[in-house]
Amino acid sequence: MTKKQRDIVFDRASELHTPVCEVMVPGVCGYNATQWHHRKLRSQGGTNEASNGCAVCALCHDHIHRNTGRAYEKGWLVKSHANPLETPCLRRGEYVVLDDEGGYTPEMETE
């Protein structure tokens, strides 16, 4: 992963110049983002693009990998056949679609 790729994700996560966990699992989160999490695992073809990354605290990162069923439901993990650019994830309590420029858009609700 390049410094630029890492910076894009950690800039998206920053509030007042401090990277804050993008996952924020209630009752688990340690708040400060210190790790990069690949939504689609590298072993499944995941890249280092911003849409495939979340800045997370160590506690949420551990929770994701210990609770994979929930992580796939929340979009924190992405299946090998899916595209992270098209897979919403729960970011700080809101479902969003991440882009490769370091931004995100709220998921459109369907009826």
Predicted regions, residues:
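Arg/Lys-rich, low-complexity, intrinsically disordered N-terminal tails that contact nucleic acids
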Residues: M1-V9, Y104-E111
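Short connector loops at helix/strand junctions that flank enzyme active sites
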Residues: L16, N48-N52, P84
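Histidine-centered nuclease catalytic patch
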Residues: E22-A55, R66-K74
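Context-gated lysine
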Residues: K3-K4, K40, K74, K79
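Short flanking/linker segments adjacent to small metal-binding domains or redox-active Cys/His motifs
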Residues: W76-E111
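Short cysteine-rich loop/turn motifs with clustered Cys
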Residues: T2-Q35, C54-C60
